[in-house]
Amino acid sequence: MGFRLPGIRKASFSANQASSKAVDVEKGYLAVYVGEKMRRFVIPVSYLNKPSFQDLLSQAEEEFGYHHPNGGLTIPCSEDVFQHITSFLN
């Protein structure tokens, strides 16, 4: 079960990666955690400059401050909303 969205890469874990805390992310990309299940998405850093994505970052700051439970950036919205917003950023 999978889907492909241009510009977004759903993180895949191998056995070795799952056991380590930090999983490599390609240069120019950023890992974020989204939804109740904290699904990991790898997005282009260029999204950080987009107003609609900055709204998500503001929500994350309001909810989590600068402490994110997974150690990475957590976006407080559903996966569907996240995918909808990011689909317009490509």
From Swiss-Prot:
Name under which the protein is recorded: Auxin-induced protein 6B
Keywords in alphabetical order: Auxin signaling pathway
GO biological process: auxin-activated signaling pathway
InterPro entries assigned to the protein according to its UniProt record, in alphabetical order: SAUR_fam
Lineage top rank: taxon: Eukaryota
Keyword hit for Phosphoprotein: no
Induction: By auxin.
One Pfam family per UniProt: Auxin_inducible
Family: Belongs to the ARG7 family.
Endpoints of the signal sequence: none
